[in-house]
């Protein structure tokens, strides 16, 4: 099954810990008490949201930033403030963190809802999480009473190669290789 097939069937929820854009999930966000529309420009990404909320470390932030600037807490807050066409001095740290929290909530709600639907459709009893966000998913699924194995916790650095290995195995089984 290709990624296109998975998207068509709803089996691929294409959102991630690092490169997803903030407006891919948010149209409006509550900032400092005001519902505020979000710019569609690429001002910040999911890595900024997860970084300022403590879900990933600076070392985990392994992709280029939206503005080419440094990967620091302050720089991530500034990028997040740009999502509502603002500067950090205008909305403050709390406003930028509201944007981050709203994005992560939308992202995790989407993932949890789709995983529940897919598990029901396929009669699955548990899931496997892998990748840089596996610890986020493991907690999300535990809170949602979904049994989950965190490959990163179980296999360490070798877990990074497991999704590629799974694709190769699937390709072999379907005769692609």
PLM feature spans:
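Helical "lid/coupling" subdomains associated with nucleotide-phosphate turnover
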Residues: 1-177
């Amino acid at each position: 099954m290709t990624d296109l097939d998975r998207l068509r069937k709803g089996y691929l929820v294409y959102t991630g810990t690092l490169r997803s854009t903030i407006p891919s999930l948010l149209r409006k966000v509550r900032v400092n008490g005001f519902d505020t529309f979000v710019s569609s420009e690429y001002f910040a990404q999911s890595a900024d949201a997860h970084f300022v909320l403590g879900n990933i470390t600076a070392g985990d932030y392994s992709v280029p930033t939206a503005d080419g600037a440094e990967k620091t807490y302050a720089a991530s807050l500034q990028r997040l403030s740009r999502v509502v066409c603002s500067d950090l001095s205008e909305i403050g740290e709390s406003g930028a963190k509201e944007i981050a929290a709203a994005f992560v909530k939308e992202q995790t709600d989407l993932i949890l809802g789709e995983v529940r639907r897919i598990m029901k459709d396929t009669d699955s009893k548990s899931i496997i999480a892998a990748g840089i966000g596996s610890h986020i998913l493991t907690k999300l699924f535990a809170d949602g009473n979904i049994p989950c194995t965190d490959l990163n916790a179980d296999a360490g650095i070798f877990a990074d190669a497991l999704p590629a290995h799974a694709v190769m195995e699937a390709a072999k089984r379907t005769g692609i290789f």
